[in-house]
Structure formats: C-alpha cells, structure tokens
Amino acid sequence: MNSFPYSSIVFLFLSLILNNFIYKILFLQLCVSSTLFHLYDHEIYPQRKIYNIYYFDMVSILILALFIITNNIIFSIIITFIIIISFKKINRFSVLFYLIGLCKIVYHLLQTQNNILIISILIIAFVAFYDNDTKYSLYPYHISWKPSNALIWHICNSVFLFLYLQ
C-alpha cells in the first residue's frame, strides 16, 4: 500500500484540527472518498473501471470547493446538485471550482500573510504538481501522481487552507 494513504491522511488530519464543523464533515467525507478511490484504484482492483468512486471523489471536491468560495453550505450543495443533474461529467467543474477556491485562498493570504512564505509554498506545490509524469493507462486518468508529490501537494494546500481559516 504505497499510494493511497497520502491524501487521505492529510484530509483526516485537517478534519481533526479545523474548528469549523462543516469543514470537519467535508474533509471527513473527502478522506473517506479519497481512501476508497485510491484503495480501489491502486491496491485492490488495479485493472477495473473506477469511475463510480472517482465520481464520488469529484463530488466531494466540488462541494468543498464551492463551500470555500461561497462560505454557504446550503448554496454549495444546491449548486452541486444542479451541476450533477445538468452535466454527466463533473470533473471539469470540480477542477475549475477547486482552482477558483485555491486562487481565492492564495489571494487572501498574499494580502494578510508573509508573501515570501506563501509564494514559496505555492512554488513547491506546483513543482510537485508538474513533476508527475507516470503514464497511467486506466480510465479516468492520463497521468498518475507520484506518492511523494501527492503528499507535498496536499500538505501545501492544507497549509493554505489552515492559514486562510485562522
């Protein structure tokens, strides 16, 4: 089991240390979906289609990203259901709103925190993101994360979120 724990452990840790109850629930949901996804993806059935679990993971990311953007859980859930009903594939929406939420957090941190620290963490995160060149032949992936890069990416995002919520 050398691939699944990294993102799940970071999400579990965030759900334990954050004070906001809604964030606790959303990160626990993301921890469970990420664990199932990576177990099923890499460890249990590496040759099977994993789209159903991938879809659940994308829904978790979408709700969390919308909550970060709107700061309203009811509105976030309603938008998520509208997107799910309207579109069959939601992964582009999940990634789009994730990036918008990340930009909102980074912009806020650049206004309130040490800019050199924030930019350094941002550079480390994107180096870890772009250093993934392992080709992956199974749907829905094109490129698989290296375990160390996944850990670095998720920790950087967690630091941003934790600083943002303080």
Question: Where in this protein do the model-derived segments appear?
Answer:
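Multi-pass alpha-helical transmembrane bundles in non-GPCR membrane proteins
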Residues: M1-Q166
